[in-house]
Amino acid sequence: MMTERRAKLKAKGTLRASQLMRFPTAVKRDAAIEIWMHDHPDELGAIARRWFEVMRNCGDDVRELLHDGHPTACVADAAFAYVNAFTAHVNVGFFRGAEIADPDRLLEGTGKFMRHVKIRCDSHVDAAALTKLIEVAYIDMKRRLKAE
């Protein structure tokens, strides 16, 4: 259903297409993610599981799916974060990371929208700061959805 504001913008020709990554097939719990987690039993998998669980716990409206081969967390159908395990590190990534506050300067990357935090087994990550970053990304996506 189109809101009155969106209807006015559309009538003026100023309504822009959404720049959000939308996944209408996202579900509360995706069996494919459980398989992915099972297939990553090592230390990097444990790191990925820990941070994906933080994403899952952001709110009742969090949905998930396996996108591009890695677990992705959404607010409803709009992706806000993901995890991915590589050979020597895990990325905790943010779909609109370039636009969220990062006071602890954890984010890496130079893309137009996306940023990530790289976690290696032998390095320390500020857990409180990363948890806050995930929460900020979740709240930011909720705000973006409400504004559409």
What are these regions (language model features)?
Residues 1-148:
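Charge-dense, helix-prone N-terminal extensions
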